[in-house]
Amino acid sequence: GLLSVLGSVAKHVLPHVVPVIAEHL
């Protein structure tokens, strides 16, 4: 379903987003 798609997208996106956010913190 839509949630599983969002979940798989999040798994690909989060590893790239988290380090960027951490740099600004």
UniProtKB/Swiss-Prot annotation:
The major product is Caerin-1.1; in addition, different peptides are produced that are missing some amino acid residues at the N-terminus. Caerin-1.1.1 is inactive. It is found in: Secreted. It holds the Pfam family Caerin_1. It comes from the Eukaryota. The modification Leucine amide is found at residue 25. GO terms for biological process: defense response to bacterium; defense response to virus; innate immune response. One of its GO terms (cellular component) is extracellular region. Expressed by the skin parotoid and/or rostral glands. Keywords: Amidation, Amphibian defense peptide, Antibiotic, Antimicrobial, Antiviral defense, Immunity, Innate immunity, Secreted. Contains two amphipathic alpha helix regions separated by a region of less-defined helicity and greater flexibility. Belongs to the frog skin active peptide (FSAP) family. Caerin subfamily. This is Caerin-1.1. It comes from Ranoidea splendida.
